Regions:
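Coiled-coil-like amphipathic alpha-helices with heptad-repeat character
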Residues: 3, 21-22
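A phosphate-binding catalytic loop at a beta-strand-loop-alpha-helix junction
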Residues: 143-155
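Cys-dependent protein tyrosine phosphatase-like superfamily
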Residues: 23-142, 157-209
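Bacterial N-terminal signal peptides that target proteins for export
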Residues: 2-11
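Bacterial N-terminal signal peptides
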Residues: 10-21
Length: 209
């Protein structure tokens, strides 16, 4: 590892340590979450996450695809559950390491919810329910990721609306702070957040195809 990469990893580790030391007491994971859901904070990826990396409260991270080192660093900072939304094809052809094997090696829980808005991998109410179960069952901090945090942002918005009683406009605003982009859409007539919730949401964009 060259000097530049060592300095980058050191800066990332320090950043996470500082964030961990400034705790708000808002626990979003586990069976008894506390407090209102705070707005996400965009963080520097330090080259360890693809395009996006954000923190919500004290114990949730939402990101694009993490690198091997990114996962190791998050594990060192207390992440115990990784939720991956990428499809098997994406993982086998676009990720240069075995993510499930690394997570097992690190002793973290791996929750695999592949989704892409296709008949085989739909955005569905069942996927949202499974994510909510992962949140409530987590023993520590949680990382939710896809490729660039777009799918993850939609899932997060749906989770806030259904399971945390966050107003729709607020949930969408917070998800946009991560990477929910209204100018992108799934195949069909609904945005992913609508498919997760099983209803139309006028507040989300519906660009013409």
């Amino acid at each position: 590892m060259n000097r530049v990469n060592i300095m980058r990893l050191s800066a990332f580790t320090v950043m996470l340590a500082v964030l961990s030391s400034v705790c708000s007491g808002q626990r979003l994971t586990g069976p008894h979450p506390t407090g209102d859901v705070p707005a996400p904070v965009a963080l520097d990826t330090h080259g360890l996450f693809q395009e996006k990396f954000a923190r919500v409260g004290d114990d949730v991270f939402i990101s694009g695809q993490p690198t091997e080192q990114g996962l190791r660093d998050l594990h060192a900072q207390g992440v115990t559950t990784v939720v991956n939304l990428r499809t098997p094809e994406e993982m086998s052809t676009r990720v240069p390491f075995n993510e499930p094997a690394l997570i097992k090696e690190l002793g973290m829980d791996y929750v695999y919810l592949p989704m892409r808005g296709t008949p085989e991998f739909p955005y569905s109410a069942d996927a949202l329910k499974s994510f909510a179960a992962a949140m409530s069952g987590a023993k520590g901090k949680v990382l939710l990721h896809c490729t660039i945090a777009w799918r993850a942002s939609h899932l997060w918005a749906a989770y806030l609306i259904k399971y945390r009683d966050v107003p729709v406009a607020t949930a969408l605003e917070q998800a946009r702070m991560i990477n929910l982009m209204d100018d992108m859409r799934m195949d069909g007539d609904r945005q992913p957040v609508e498919a997760f919730l099983g209803r139309t949401i006028p507040e989300v964009g519906h660009p013409k195809r």
